[in-house]
Design a protein with these regions (language model features):
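Charged helix-capping and loop-helix junction motifs
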Residues: 117, 143-146
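Conserved N-terminal subdomain of the carbohydrate kinase-like
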Residues: 47-135, 139
Length: 146
């Protein structure tokens, strides 16, 4: 059987979650990343290539995200790099059992994901299946949502 390619398109964000000792744990998450993560867990690499399509910066946090994806079997070959941007960030705080989220994503490279239509189209042309969410479309400028 020929290997299939599954693409998840969107914004992976850095996540800061408060720990009991007052420090914060750094992780990476987001709806489209979570989908890629579980697709990788549910399929065999020889049967399905799972790749993430996004844009990141060239800063250390973006490099850490790329390393995380690679280490967990999520392909990065379709990830664009934007030199003057970084990745989005959110903070999770707890008030009792209630979680609240604070976002910093205005300088997220993923907002520019569709700026170069040719690069995005070339990435998508490799797919047998593509996943994106409403959030993926919402972070793009109105001109690039089509």
């Amino acid at each position: 059987m020929k290997q299939k390619t599954f693409l998840s398109v969107g914004e992976c964000m850095a996540e800061l979650q408060a720990r009991d000792d007052g420090l914060y744990r750094l992780g990476f998450a987001g709806d489209t990343l979570n989908t890629a993560w579980y697709m990788r867990a549910l399929t065999r690499p020889q049967d399905v290539a799972v790749d993430y399509v996004t844009a990141v910066g060239t800063d250390p946090l973006s490099a850490k995200m790329l390393a995380f994806l690679k280490a967990n079997g999520v392909g990065t070959r379709f990830i664009q790099e934007v030199s003057d941007r970084t990745v989005g960030l959110y903070l999770i705080t707890l008030a009792g059992a209630e979680r609240s989220f604070t976002y910093w994503r205005s300088s997220s490279a993923a907002r520019l994901l569709a700026e170069n239509r040719e690069v995005l189209a070339a990435s998508l042309s490799h797919a047998d299946a593509i996943y994106f969410s409403g959030i993926t479309l919402a972070i793009l400028s109105p001109a690039h949502r089509r």
